[in-house]
């Protein structure tokens, strides 16, 4: 990455979460190490507990549920927080909430299954306390969903390869948390939950 140097590298273990602080002007690179893995991303403006990345506001900002290179992620205050500058996968989900404990109980009858919401909650411990957490605040990176003719949500097995990545320019000082999704009851992660990596780049 020309004119940038690696500032921090964070490995997010399979079915776990990780968090990092970003500065305006940084670039964040999210890498799927083994392929076919979904990462659920939440973000908050660093100096505010009342402003966070909002999928709903992002949809209306771009007038699309499909985010592409050149599109912006925005906050609940409608400020641009990230800009997508590279993406070699091309499919993501911004409609469905991240998985939580209740989803595994109600859908599959499984108690105490790991979930993206719990992964993100754990990742924030010791990094940032008191942040607003809710499943609908997640962007499901590399998740291959589509909406059918009748409006139904169709979950498809991902097809992206190892080392697939997306890179975003950071536009506001922010805090991010990423869950390497632990969903193993559907083909969401290719039936094999695996690790992800966050690379943070700064200008030289």
Label each residue range with its predicted role.
Residues 1-204:
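Acidic, Ser/Thr/Pro
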């Amino acid at each position: 990455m020309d004119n940038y140097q690696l500032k921090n590298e964070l490995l997010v273990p399979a079915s776990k979460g990780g968090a990092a602080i970003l500065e305006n002007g940084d670039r964040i690179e999210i890498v799927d190490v083994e392929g076919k893995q979904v990462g659920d991303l939440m973000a908050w403006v660093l100096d505010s507990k009342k402003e966070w990345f909002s999928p709903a506001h992002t949809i209306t900002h771009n007038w699309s549920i499909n985010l592409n290179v050149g599109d912006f992620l925005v906050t609940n205050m409608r400020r641009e927080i990230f800009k997508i500058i590279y993406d070699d996968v091309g499919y993501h989900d911004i409609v469905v909430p991240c998985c939580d404990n209740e989803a595994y109980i109600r859908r599959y009858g499984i108690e105490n299954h790991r979930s993206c919401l719990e992964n993100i909650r754990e990742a924030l411990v010791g990094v940032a306390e008191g942040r607003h957490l809710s499943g609908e605040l997640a962007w499901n990176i590399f998740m291959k969903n589509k909406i059918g003719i009748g409006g139904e949500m169709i979950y498809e097995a991902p097809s992206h390869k190892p080392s697939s990545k997306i890179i975003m320019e950071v536009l506001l000082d922010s805090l991010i948390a990423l869950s390497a999704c632990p969903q193993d009851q559907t083909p969401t992660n290719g039936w094999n939950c695996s690790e992800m990596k966050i690379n943070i780049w700064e200008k030289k």
